[in-house]
Amino acid sequence: MIDIRLIREKPDFVKKALEKRNYEKKMVDDLLSLDAQFRELTNQINQLRAQRNSISKMVAQAKSSGKTEEIENLTEEGKKIGRQIDSIEDQLKEIKVQMEKLMLLVPNIPDDSVPEGKDETSNREIRKWGDPKKFDYNPQAHWDLGPSLGLMDFDRAAKLSGSRFTVMYGMFAKLERALTNFMLDMHTKEHGYTEVWLPHIVKRETMTITGQLPKFEEEAYRIEADDLFLIPTAEVPLVALRSNEILEEKDLPLLYTAYTPCYRREAGSYGKDVRGMIRQHQFDKVELVWITTPERSFEDLETLVSHAEEVLRRLELPYRVIQLCSGDLGFGAAKTYDLEVWLPSYNSYKEISSCSNDTDFQARRGNIRYRRKDGKISFVHTLNGSGVAVGRTLVAIIENYQRADGRIDVPKALQPYLGCEVLG
């Protein structure tokens, strides 16, 4: 949620920011109209309350003088003002609800460093690491290689749950677990994160804090009987951990990491990446979250990105870093870098991590603040990123490390976790 004062004081700036993000600028005019009504009614109700207080004093004076008729007239006038106040209070409540609903649909403001563009075609490549492997044979896609080894089963997954689910056996199941432990060990032992074990089911309010609701409710798995949601990412509970709290500046930044399954309906992605494990309804991910100060948040974003990159470097997987343009930014992000790993089956790079600075957008929605050294209370900035998506990393290893005979070499960094050098 952005600051309503920004909309009041710089409406043209906000409209331009919304246009950069392909959003309708009309919502700014709608908010300004509601805000003007709210402030006008607030002035009216304050004046009426002042009148009522004045009448109360006059009634007291009349009582002391025994002026019965005056008391009755003043009392009736006071009741009339009270009814006016009640009516205006009802109007204020309704306007406040409308404003809150509309404010929750306004995206974050892109940072000045974000390139302007309509869609992903305007994204910028920042850097590459590693060279895609050149095979002297036709490499297999993971959706062929996995089943041929008897370690990946899409048919039985469909029998259990429908499309876009996977069953893995034996060493592939162990590889998924090894990757999770490898990532968590790196982030906690080398990068200073605190590991957190989290609920995978959260309240509507929790989903609203990070911006999943109300805009993306159709993408979420909802438990209707209890109005609870399966998390689409560990970012949701990690950020909300500190909602309605005031932190101390000396304790910032807070660095959290968590492994969780993630659940997404993918309602808007029909026909995309329908084969294999690239786009699943359930997938594993190690998440990284920072709660930091405004002064250092963009520098911290660069650090967070480097932590995600280090996972891919240790696994010796070719990747590139992309900066998203304004039209491709996520709803709550002010600035985002995507990490894309090379996949031979696509002969291209595919997203494996998205790292964002949400500035104070989530903090305002969740009322996450901190006390500065001078005693002033301000909103924190929140950062999030995948460190990284486990299933897509598994796919990248299977495809990039495959041999001509179908067996798969194990990256050196994972050999201590798996206890072997070759799979299959």
UniProtKB/Swiss-Prot annotation:
**Which amino acids does the record list as binding L-serine?**
T233, A234, E235, E287, S386
Domain of life where this protein originates: Bacteria
**Binding of ATP: at which residues?**
R264, R265, E266, E351, I352, S353, S354
**Record key words, sorted:** Aminoacyl-tRNA synthetase, ATP-binding, Cytoplasm, Ligase, Nucleotide-binding, Protein biosynthesis
Task: Write down the chemical reaction(s) this protein catalyses.
Answer: tRNA(Ser) + L-serine + ATP = L-seryl-tRNA(Ser) + AMP + diphosphate + H(+); tRNA(Sec) + L-serine + ATP = L-seryl-tRNA(Sec) + AMP + diphosphate + H(+)
The Gene Ontology biological process annotation of the record reads:
selenocysteine biosynthetic process; seryl-tRNA aminoacylation
Disulfide-bond pairs as recorded: none
Task: Name the enzyme's class.
Answer: ligase
The answer, when asked if Amino-acid biosynthesis is one of the entry's keywords, is no
Record-linked PROSITE patterns: AA_TRNA_LIGASE_II
Enumerate the Gene3D superfamilies for this protein: Bira Bifunctional Protein, Domain 2, Serine-tRNA synthetase, tRNA binding domain
One CC-aspect GO term: cytoplasm
Q: In which pathway does it act?
A: Aminoacyl-tRNA biosynthesis; selenocysteinyl-tRNA(Sec) biosynthesis; L-seryl-tRNA(Sec) from L-serine and tRNA(Sec): step 1/1
Q: One of this protein's Pfam families, by short name? A: Seryl_tRNA_N
- Indicate yes or no for the key word Aminoacyl-tRNA synthetase: yes
Q: What is its EC number?
A: 6.1.1.11
Primary localization: cytoplasm
Compartments where located: Cytoplasm
Supply the domain comment: Consists of two distinct domains, a catalytic core and a N-terminal extension that is involved in tRNA binding.
Describe its function.
Answer: Catalyzes the attachment of serine to tRNA(Ser). Is also able to aminoacylate tRNA(Sec) with serine, to form the misacylated tRNA L-seryl-tRNA(Sec), which will be further converted into selenocysteinyl-tRNA(Sec).
The record describes its quaternary structure and partners as: Homodimer. The tRNA molecule binds across the dimer.
Q: Which family does it belong to?
A: Belongs to the class-II aminoacyl-tRNA synthetase family. Type-1 seryl-tRNA synthetase subfamily.
**Stated name of the protein:** Serine--tRNA ligase
Q: Which gene does this sequence derive from?
A: serS
